[in-house]
């Protein structure tokens, strides 16, 4: 009887191990699907660091300090000016989660971005990487409070269908631009009720609006080191600069697009892509 129980347990152990492995793989795949890698840029302008150098030690120390700061992941943003032990060399680190992402999800995105950025830009003194839920940048030059247009990029997520009867023509583009203007104004005037003891505007807003018989979902966000005025300037510049990103002439508005940037970004799709329940300033127009 005891030998039968023992053999039964021996059979169950590998099955349980296999089930645990499958569950782990499923969770990893789910994370990658919900938070896909978008783009990265290794900056050659600031040169490279050597392994064991003061810059590398300062960078590692700053990243390690950031990873332990729970307030960063509660609030979803940090701009860090970190010096080496001698106080002679500075590293500037910027990290921000999408406006609806907080806590463990924000921390998870940071861990993913950190590992991947060091893999893709192993020796660069300056680099930036974007995921769907966050971005991470480090630099040897101060970037805080300044609008950076150099690292902007458009990602056209879908093409417009020429035979579509809705969402086409100049009227839809103009309506889309008015929607973005309204959303930006909300982002720079309304605070984030999900983050305590922060009185400044959220610099984030999202929402949805019906165009014809379908809906369009939109989001705009600026980094928290910008002033509200600088946020408006950044968004307006990118809307003008990347007109081809969201407009498919002469058809009209594309089905979806996003503009990534160090200082501000915006996105629109024909499907929901943010969590309305955790999004500050989520509106239905």
Curated annotation (Swiss-Prot):
The protein's name in its UniProt record: Putative cysteine-rich repeat secretory protein 14
Record lineage: Eukaryota, Viridiplantae, Streptophyta, Embryophyta, Tracheophyta
Stored Gene3D superfamilies: Gnk2 domain, C-X8-C-X2-C motif
Cited InterPro entries: CRR_secretory_protein, GNK2, GNK2_sf
Keywords assigned: Repeat, Secreted, Signal
Major site of localization recorded for this protein: secreted
GO CC terms, sorted: extracellular region
Signal peptide as annotated in the record: 1-30
Compartmental location: Secreted
Alphabetical list of PANTHER family matching this protein: CYSTEINE-RICH REPEAT SECRETORY PROTEIN 18-RELATED, CYSTEINE-RICH REPEAT SECRETORY PROTEIN 38-RELATED
Domain Gnk2-homologous: 37-143, 161-273
Annotated source species: Arabidopsis thaliana
Family: Belongs to the cysteine-rich repeat secretory protein family.
UniProt KW DNA-binding keyword: no
């Amino acid at each position: 009887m005891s030998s039968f129980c023992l053999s039964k347990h021996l059979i169950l152990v590998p099955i349980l191990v296999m089930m645990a492995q499958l569950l782990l793989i499923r969770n990893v795949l789910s994370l990658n699907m919900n938070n896909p890698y978008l783009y990265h840029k290794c900056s050659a302008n600031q040169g490279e660091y050597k392994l064991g150098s003061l810059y590398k030690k300062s960078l590692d120390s700053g990243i390690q300090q950031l990873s332990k700061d729970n307030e960063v992941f509660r609030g979803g943003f940090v701009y860090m000016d970190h010096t080496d032990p001698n106080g002679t060399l500075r590293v500037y680190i910027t990290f921000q989660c999408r406006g609806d992402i907080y806590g463990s999800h924000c921390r998870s995105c940071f861990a993913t971005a950190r590992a991947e950025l060091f893999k893709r830009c192993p020796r660069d003194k300056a680099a930036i990487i974007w995921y769907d839920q966050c971005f991470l940048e480090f630099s040897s030059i101060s970037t805080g409070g300044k609008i950076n247009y150099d690292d902007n990029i458009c990602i056209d997520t879908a093409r417009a269908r020429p035979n579509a009867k809705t969402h086409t023509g100049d009227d839809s583009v103009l309506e889309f631009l008015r929607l973005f203007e309204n959303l930006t104004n909300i982002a720079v005037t309304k605070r984030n009720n999900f983050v305590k003891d922060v009185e400044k505007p959220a610099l984030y807003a999202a929402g949805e609006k019906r165009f014809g018989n379908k809906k369009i979902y939109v989001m705009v966000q600026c980094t928290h080191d910008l002033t509200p005025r600088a946020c408006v300037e950044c968004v307006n510049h990118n809307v003008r600069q990347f007109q081809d990103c969201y407009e498919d002439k002469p058809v009209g508005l594309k089905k979806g697009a996003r503009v990534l940037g160090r200082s501000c970004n915006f996105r629109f799709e024909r499907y929901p892509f943010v969590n309305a329940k955790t999004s500050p300033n989520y509106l239905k127009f």
